[in-house]
């Protein structure tokens, strides 16, 4: 599975860095997205989610006021993801409505790393 992370930064101690590294170590293909960075986690950075050819999940590490704009960008993708994931502390009714109306699953206010670990534990 391929996961694009909007707001990707490899700054030690930040949640986005911990989660990105965790997903890479878990075997996911992680695509960092950030308009001002060239490389994150030793990977090429996409300046916008619209530049990503395809991914299964978009994980958002941005403040809630930016969610609707990123939802619009996701809808402009040629190959849309099946899920738009807003990290813990982030929710946006407007983004949720935009995406769900187009058949994209939306997760709000949940950490993808915590949920992944929980699912692994319940499966074992």
Task: Write out the residue ranges for each language-model feature.
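NAD(P)-binding Rossmann-fold cofactor-contacting core
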Residues: 13-14, 20-41
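Glycine-rich, highly charged phosphate/nucleotide-binding loops
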Residues: 39-72
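Short, charged, surface-exposed secondary-structure boundary motifs
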Residues: 40-43, 94-97, 115-121
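ADP-ribose/adenylate-binding Rossmann-like module
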Residues: 77-99
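Short hydrophobic/aromatic-enriched beta-strand-loop microsegments
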Residues: 81-85, 103-110
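Active-site capping/gating segments
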Residues: 105-124
């Amino acid at each position: 599975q391929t996961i694009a992370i909007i707001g990707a930064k490899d700054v030690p101690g930040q949640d986005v860095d911990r989660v990105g590294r965790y997903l890479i170590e878990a075997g996911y293909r992680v695509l960092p997205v950030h308009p001002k960075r060239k490389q994150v986690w030793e990977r090429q950075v996409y300046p916008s989610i619209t530049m990503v050819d395809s991914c299964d999940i978009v994980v958002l590490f941005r403040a809630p006021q930016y969610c609707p704009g990123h939802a619009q960008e996701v809808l402009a993708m040629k190959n849309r993801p099946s899920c738009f994931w807003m990290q813990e502390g982030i929710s946006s009714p407007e983004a949720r409505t935009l995406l769900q109306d187009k058949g994209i699953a939306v997760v709000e206010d949940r950490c993808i790393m915590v949920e992944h670990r929980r699912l692994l534990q319940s499966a074992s």
